[in-house]
Amino acid sequence: MTGRGLLVGLTAASVGVIYGYDLSSIAGARLFIAEDFHLTTRQQELVTTMVVIGQIVGALAAGVIANAIGRKRSTVLLTAGYAVCAILGACAVSLPMLLAARLLLGVAIGIAVVVVPVYVAESAPTAVRGSLLTAYQVTILVGIILGYLVGYLLAGAHAWRWILGIAAIPAVVLLPLLIRMPDTARWYLLKGRVEDARRALSRVEPDADVESQLTEIAVALKDEGSGKVSEMIRRPYLRATVFVVVLGFLVQITGINAIIYYSPTIFAEMGFHGDFALLGLPALVQLAGLSAVFVSLFSVDRLGRRPILLSGIVMMIVADATLMVIFANSSGSGLVLGFGGILLFIVGFNFGFGSLVWVYAGESFPSRLRSLGSSVMLTSTLTGNALIAGFFLTMLQLLGGAGVFAVFGGLTVVAFFVVYRYAPETKGRELEEIRLFWENGGRWPTDSS
């Protein structure tokens, strides 16, 4: 593998920074937007949820866009669009204007979270494909940490406009790098551009047998037309579709973005006070989560996907049980243990779900369906995200912290059994081998059973 091949994957993965920043920056900005615009609880939930609704729209359109104009061009356009929408949100003078800007921002993010994992999966050398997809989660976490830190540093001035507007900076920085990157050989072959495909492979892995790789890809694409959603809900890909839809929904409905979006409120409910506790501590938690991703990053291609994923889910279950006890106690004497519960949840999520969900999104479908498959998975994920963003504060008022984390804990147990039963181990497998797994009814062709 060459530095050029690594650069292609890492540049695309760096788009995760802008996604991560938006996830966490709203946590701090929401506190001050609520003061300036005198928002009710429901309106605060709407400010958070509007970007998720936009993401659903973007996710539904992303597969078609990526197949039509390519993975690279899609990534360049969405990055530029994100910068513009971030500035519009920062300049909002009313709640409707802010909601509209957040909606458009969400569309750009929705396209990004579909196209970027596909771009990385199709660009990266096989030996490090899993690690580079995990690196995408690393960049999301870097963005999340930056969002909390910016919110903390600007909290005293209540400068929510700066918190939102700063999001445009990483997008502008990334654009020149993205413009220089090639598209993927698989997309070029989908469009019949053989010479472009050959050049793309040579730039990524100049020492590899390019002609052999082109032949393998061409064989996989032979007699394949444009991917259609209708094909995904029929055999042999129905099983893969159901798997990624359920997995995507469980990733969010188990509560990760409740902690990211509303961490200041959660910490306050546990008894924490002050800007550092409400915005600085979440940044420290995410820093620990980043460490967990690095461990996963260097382990995924050696240990495999399943052991890491299942271990992370177990940590989340233990964390939910801990938080349920802390909130049920409600004496304010368990602050350290409560912080530990949040910390363990974030570490477990980022070690397992957060690191590997994008691996399955990029690996579960053949080339013609890969963008559509990622769109379907993200749409499912965002549906769970929208439910969390739109109703968490209301749930907290109705059920209390103990009730909310009891619900999250039960859903995480369900997630464990789903992954244990249905998630394939794809370590060391070529993308076309993984396609045969799903075509064979969820069994590897060499299995005797």
Model-derived features: positions:
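Alpha-helical transmembrane bundle of multi-pass membrane proteins
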Residues: M1-D196, K222-S449
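TPR/TPR-like (Sel1-like) alpha-helical repeat modules
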Residues: V194, S202-A208
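Alpha-helix N-cap/helix-initiation sites
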Residues: D207-E211, A277
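Short, well-structured alpha-helical segments
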Residues: V210-V219
